[in-house]
Amino acid sequence: MSDGKLERRKKLMAITLEKIGKIVEVLPVFFHTKETINVIGEPGMGKTEILSGEMENLITLEVERVWGGEAEMKKKGFDVKNHYSFIDGSGMPTEAIVIPYINNEAVDHLQRDLIPELKKARRFLADKKNDGLTYVIFIDEFTSFNQSDQRTLMNLIQSGLLPDGTRIDKKRIWFILAGNPAPSIPGFEDSDSPTHEMELAVITRGATFFVAPDVDSFLLWGATASKQWTGEKLVGRSNIHPYLLSALTKNKELYNKKDITDVRVLNSRTAKKLSNYLYGVEDLKAQKKGDHCWQSIVIEAYAGVNIGQSLASTIQHLDSLVSPTELFGDGKTNKISKADPIVKKFEAMDGFEKYYLLLKATEDGSGVDFSNENYVYKLCWIMGNLTVPSEVFGALGDRVLNAPEGTNVKNLFDNKYFQAAPDSGYNFLIELAQLRNLTKSIE
């Protein structure tokens, strides 16, 4: 693009960079309306992991509601990956491998690699078992497609017409697009991402968000509770394992840190995969499928040797702390005081240690059941009488306010004592949740 055209475009476009965490808040509405969203931002900032994680959460909640609970989900063999297609535009062949098909007004061409995913969507929508359910097509690296393919995909979204002439029900299909910015976009002039210009059709046929790199949004999203299917049951847990959240809250510089001695890096993608591994270990132990424990070799496999060793050391340290059940007791009484040796240990902990322990306590299966009012009282007392970092208030505030139905943290939110207790700092939780981006980092 010439300098003159770029200057004219700058005058026409006023780009506001949003934090990815802010966009996550509005995703349920787009999931409901099936309006396309397009998220543009630099690579490595967590777009794909955050969007896909939230997408899986929305799908799981919808299936639980439509099918009537986890018993039916298990009976019907629920697998969230059967409910969406993930298409990586960067993996599309560079040569013109295309298939012509008839659209309303013209003959379009579509990459051959896309056809199986579109057929998968059609089969899903035709299956009576899936009546009332949404199918999602997530196209990552959308700007890796040339402009001709971008137009073709937009025509598909607009018309719902598949290459074989059949149509898909647009009211039951939701498109998510994510891509890297072209240098012609104001605010991204220095971008060196390999990308094509974004078609105007993409911008006008959906809500286009431009996002800025923001590790704090990634950590905040990671601390939010969602419902996840283990293959056996639904559990409420963090989007990112509390081990990693606490370690990264303590050492944010480890996130996306380049190591000249190792090609591996701890970014949003590897953090999510490492989190899945850590939860997988917990699931196997809970299902009594062996005496499993996390291994530092796996952490290094995702994050690299140097950063992996630092993470493993922090996780090992967190493992040595008092457990949530030691801090909260057996739930038979609400007695708790500063004279209690366990409470003294908690009070002496660093901020990131308290962060881990309280987040872990609100997960399903932690041994601290917040449908029991004695546990609720103790949490309220801890938040009101002990030294708790502001990050914990912010993370718990978001966690409580956005808790899915049927989870441990939702039990906490619904508890009348928690909402009324003067010690709970309930209003403070809400206030900090709304102002979460202003909280200080844990020293």
Describe every region a protein language model picked out.
Residues R9-F86, S90-I137, F142-E443:
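C-terminal regulatory/interaction module of P-loop NTP-utilizing enzymes
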Residues L6:
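Cationic, low-complexity basic patches in intrinsically disordered or flexible, solvent-exposed regions
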